[in-house]
Amino acid sequence: MKVRASLKSLKDKDGSQVVRRRGKLYVVNKRNPRWKGRQG
């Protein structure tokens, strides 16, 4: 999982979902887990 300042490029990937957990923004991608990320 990458920690990024901006999730814009990750959320545009095919199969990505933006999720908010414990006040942090995450991108999860079950099709291609390589594109997982957290903002901050």
UniProtKB/Swiss-Prot annotation:
Domain of life: Bacteria
GO molecular function: structural constituent of ribosome
One GO CC term on file: ribonucleoprotein complex
Tagged with keyword Ribonucleoprotein: yes
InterPro entries noted in UniProt: Ribosomal_bL36, Ribosomal_bL36_sp, Ribosomal_L36_bact
Keywords annotated in UniProt: Ribonucleoprotein, Ribosomal protein
Gene Ontology biological process terms from the UniProt entry: translation
Family assignment from sequence similarity: Belongs to the bacterial ribosomal protein bL36 family.
PANTHER family: 50S RIBOSOMAL PROTEIN L36 2, LARGE RIBOSOMAL SUBUNIT PROTEIN BL36B
HAMAP family tied to this protein: Ribosomal_bL36 (MF_00251)
Protein name: Large ribosomal subunit protein bL36A
Species: Saccharopolyspora erythraea (strain ATCC 11635 / DSM 40517 / JCM 4748 / NBRC 13426 / NCIMB 8594 / NRRL 2338)
Organism placement in taxonomy: Bacteria, Bacillati, Actinomycetota, Actinomycetes, Pseudonocardiales
Originating gene: rpmJ1
